[in-house]
Amino acid sequence: MIKTQSKLSDPRLQSRIGYEFKQLELLQLALTHRSVSHKYNYERLEFLGDSLLGMIIANYLYQAYPHENEGRLTRMRATLVRQEALGKIANDLKLSRCLILSTGELKSGGHHRESILADTVEAIIGAIYVDSNDLNLLKNIVLKWYIPYLDHIEPTDQLKDPKSRLQEYLQARKKPLPVYEVVDIQGDAPNQHFKVVCLVEGLPRVMGEGSSRRFAEQTAAAEILKLLEQ
C-alpha cells in the first residue's frame, strides 16, 4: 500500500496538470523524492513516464514533419525531452511548491533543482497513464503542456544549444563573446544547484540556474537570446 499525505499541498495542481486523478495517491507518489523514502518514491513512475514521453513526442514529430529525415527528427526529440525542456514545463506547472522532499533535500534547494523537477514531470506522466489507462488522453495532456515550445522547434539551427547559438550570433556581428561566471553553488555533489551569470557587452547581467554548471550556463544563454530577439 502506498503511504500518502491526506491532501495535496497545492489543491490547484491537478487543474494546472489538466487531469483529475481517480487515485490521488499516484499523484502524491509522483511528487515524492527518494530522499523521503527509498521504497515509496517517484522513480518507477519516472521510468514509465520517460518512455511514454519519448513515444508521444516522437509520434508528434513524425506527423508534424513528414519530410524530415530520421537524424533531424531524433535531434528534435532530444531537444524537447531533455532536462532543460522538462524543467521549463515543471515551472509552468509550478511543481516546485508541490514536491515532497526530505528536510535535508529541501534545505539544499532541491525544490528548485532542475534534475528533480524534470524527473517529477516524467513521473506525473507515468502516474496519469497508470491512473487513466488511456494513452490518447495522456497524449493530449502532454502536448498541451508543450504548446508554448512546439511552435519554436525547428529542424535546423534551433536544435543547437543556446550557448552555441549565442556565440554564433555575437561572432557574426563581430562582438565580444559572452562571459559566464558562477555566482552560487548550493548543496553537495551530485545534487548541486548552480547559479551562473552571463555577461554580454551592452546587455544587462542575466542569471541562469540548473543542476550543473553547464545547464545553468545554457539557461542564462537562452535568456540573453530572448533579450536579443526583442
From Swiss-Prot:
SMART domains cross-referenced by the UniProt entry: DSRM, RIBOc
Active site annotation, chain numbering: D50, E122
Superkingdom of this protein's organism: Bacteria
Keywords assigned: Cytoplasm, Endonuclease, Hydrolase, Magnesium, Metal-binding, mRNA processing, Nuclease, RNA-binding, rRNA processing, rRNA-binding, tRNA processing
Subcellular location: Cytoplasm
Function: Digests double-stranded RNA. Involved in the processing of primary rRNA transcript to yield the immediate precursors to the large and small rRNAs (23S and 16S). Processes some mRNAs, and tRNAs when they are encoded in the rRNA operon. Processes pre-crRNA and tracrRNA of type II CRISPR loci if present in the organism.
Name of protein: Ribonuclease 3
